């Protein structure tokens, strides 16, 4: 059985870990980094770039460079958050798919579902693991924000499938971090608050770690969060400040210039990181734009105090879910024994200060905020594979689940923070006499009004025998698996007729869609391979042209004018095809140049070696004379001394 790898699929960065014996190990990517930017770019020549390579070219290719895709995953285009937040913050096109989902599109018009883009990041993780292990990897545990709803969880599973991974378990990020901490911690019973402020989402989980019959039991008591609060928002706050300051100085609004906007975004992210350790930083972007008077440069000093004032409301926004999570767990702040900080944004001193103020204790600094989640995912992978024996994980569903009942009310079957897996049934009836069918409208959320909650799906239970209203007994059962994904069934108790729905279509992707995307991904892998072969052929050709001309120049008059002409002609022939996309033509012309150049070079170098050999022979005789001279001198000196 192959390894089950652990992947933290983040909004900004992703991380990979595997179990190495009894411990989880974070694996470096091909570039030697322990985290990989969750950025995917589609270039003009059809190449797909992932990670650092994609991030590096974002400034020159803003329309086709996709970042923060996790904020779109499993969401509808008409969602308020998509309209108000995402569309205003990203340079690429967010479009409405035929099924109403939020998709993205390249400037060439290629439409893609968010799971399809995320799958490219997962595929890079998969390859990194395979390169490290030297064997195929087909199974993974992938983490999601605790506050992700059913649609977002299912969409994440779809992304795994498109990447060629069977997702054995979806686990919550704070839970994974607690798992990483809890497995190493041997301090007995603890109540831990995991404050997870990542690139795109915020979660708070209250978790109990206890020793139960020798097993490390990690039980989630409650969870809360905000799926639209993260480091990206901190970047945008600073970016908008820089743009506003530049507008005050120069009278030019950079919001409409995608290239400039991307440069300012990158500079804001860099400045944010620097301000975690420095009191002030300079943001210096020469030639950011130009007008009739000439080029303009952006040069703005930003102090830590200024940055903190720009984002203080974002930090304060994270504290409300903390209060709710404590209430749901039935605990007070004094009951918390440890506070863990997870997610790169928790490196910001203001965040650490406010968390310390809220919980009344110093957060732990010995947990790596970028890696803890992936480590926890790898440990869960080890549990599922049977390699880790003494850990029991009890997670919860983050939001209440129910159905729409008469009057447009949501009737809850499973309350939020219920330990999963779980199953719950309730009997409902008809609202009208002789009603032949009922529509089961499945909802997720905390509001009383059905329309104010997230719709997960609908299905009909038909062929109900005619009867007065209130007489038929329709048993509705909700069954949540360990991934937090829901199965709903409805059964007419009189006839035994049953209808059920796995909330699969909520990500908007059917099995056929996913299968097509898997095939596209495989085709992309093939085209990527062909592209790399083409680049390799071009490099070989360029090297041969350079070395041929250099050698002919060095050999000078040892090569006849006719031979020089032949080599130059073959070089020009190769140059005429080397920039094209026909690998066979490049290979053929490369071979032709080799066939012309090799015999000329061999002959010339053989003559050169022969001449050198003859010269060497002459030199070999000379030392004898020298020896005689030295000996004679030596004897002469001795004679004089006598």
UniProtKB/Swiss-Prot annotation:
It comes from Francisella philomiragia subsp. philomiragia (strain ATCC 25017 / CCUG 19701 / FSC 153 / O#319-036). Pfam families: HSP70 (PF00012). This is Chaperone protein DnaK. Acts as a chaperone. The modification Phosphothreonine is found at residue 201. Induction: By stress conditions e.g. heat shock. It comes from the Bacteria. GO terms for molecular function: ATP binding; ATP-dependent protein folding chaperone; unfolded protein binding. Residues 628-642 have a biased composition (Acidic residues). Residues 607-642 are annotated as: Disordered. Belongs to the heat shock protein 70 family. The keyword Transmembrane does not apply. HAMAP family: DnaK (MF_00332). The gene is dnaK. Residues 607-620 have a biased composition (Low complexity). Keywords: ATP-binding, Chaperone, Nucleotide-binding, Phosphoprotein, Stress response. PROSITE patterns: HSP70_1, HSP70_2, HSP70_3.
